C-alpha cells in the first residue's frame, strides 16, 4: 500500500531555510565581487592622490578601502577564507591591469592577455570548487 505524505510546517521551514542559505551564498559572492571592484577603485585612487597629498582623491581612496574591506568581511561570513581572499585579490589584480591598459596605454601584448586569462580561470575554478 502506498503511503501518502502531507506537507508539514517543518517541511516549509526546511524549504525556507535552504532558499535563505542560497540567498546568503549569492549575497556573499555579490559582496565579494563588489569588494573586488572597489579594490580596483582604491588602487586607482592611490594613483590620483599623488602620494596621498591631494585631499579628494585621498578621501575617495580611504572610503573605497573601507567599503572594500567591509564587503570582504561580509563575504567571509559565508565563504571559505582562502577562496574569498584569492578571488578578491584576483578581481583587484585583473581589474587594475585592465584599467592600466585602457586608461594608461599599458602594454596589451598576447602574453599579458594569456596571464590575465589564467588568473580569471583560477578564480572561476575556485568559485566552482567552493563548497558554498
Mark where each language-model region is.
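Polytopic alpha-helical membrane proteins, predominantly small-molecule transporters/carriers
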Residues: 2-132
Amino acid at each position: 500500500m502506498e503511503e501518502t505524505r502531507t506537507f508539514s510546517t517543518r517541511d516549509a521551514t526546511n524549504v525556507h531555510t535552504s532558499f535563505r542559505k542560497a540567498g546568503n551564498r549569492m549575497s556573499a559572492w555579490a559582496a565579494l565581487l563588489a569588494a573586488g571592484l572597489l579594490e580596483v577603485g582604491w588602487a586607482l585612487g592611490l594613483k590620483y592622490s599623488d602620494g596621498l597629498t591631494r585631499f579628494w582623491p585621498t578621501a575617495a581612496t580611504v572610503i573605497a578601502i573601507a567599503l572594500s574591506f567591509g564587503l570582504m568581511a561580509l563575504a567571509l561570513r559565508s565563504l571559505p577564507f582562502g577562496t574569498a581572499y584569492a578571488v578578491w585579490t584576483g578581481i583587484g589584480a585583473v581589474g587594475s591591469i585592465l584599467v592600466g591598459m585602457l586608461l594608461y596605454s599599458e602594454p596589451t601584448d598576447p602574453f599579458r592577455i594569456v596571464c590575465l586569462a589564467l588568473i580569471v580561470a583560477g578564480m572561476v575554478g575556485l568559485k566552482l570548487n567552493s563548497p558554498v
